């Protein structure tokens, strides 16, 4: 029985690390393509904008799916956050979660056809910048664990 639990725990940890590395890659692709799209809005051609827009949507949808899986894997953290408050829990993680929720919401609104230069589009851009900063902080705090998993 102990061996079975050990194997199960190893599988869970391996899955968490696979999801974490996939999250990192999809985050980088989404952030890079979002910044590229913003730069394209300042004068580059329509074809390039269409390519990067499609790329950004794809990378961001993969990111959204992975974040949902990641949150599910760490659901106890969120459950305790709602039950007992922030306490000594990571404020960066809590704010990052909120920013991501807002960023994903504005992204979905933009997907529905809202103009990216609208107020929602501008909010999406600034939330994206905040997300990049907070995600980098979140990643650096966990970097040693990510590397040790390789």
Question: Can you name each region flagged by the protein language model?
Answer:
Residues 2-150:
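Membrane-embedded alpha-helical bundles that constitute the cytochrome b-like, heme-associated redox core
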């Amino acid at each position: 029985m102990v061996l079975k639990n050990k194997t199960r725990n190893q599988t869970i940890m391996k899955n968490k690390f696979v999801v974490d590395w996939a999250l990192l890659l999809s985050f980088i692709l989404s952030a890079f393509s979002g910044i590229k799209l913003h730069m394209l809005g300042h004068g580059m051609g329509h074809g390039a904008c269409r390519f990067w827009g499609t790329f950004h949507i794809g990378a961001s949808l993969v990111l959204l799916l992975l974040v949902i899986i990641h949150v599910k894997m760490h659901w106890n953290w969120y459950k305790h956050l709602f039950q007992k408050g922030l306490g000594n829990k990571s404020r960066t993680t809590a704010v990052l979660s909120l920013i991501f929720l807002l960023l994903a919401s504005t992204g979905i609104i933009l997907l529905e056809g809202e103009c990216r230069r609208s107020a929602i589009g501008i909010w999406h851009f600034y939330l994206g910048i905040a997300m990049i900063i907070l995600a980098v902080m979140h990643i650096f705090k966990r970097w040693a664990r990510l590397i040790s998993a390789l």
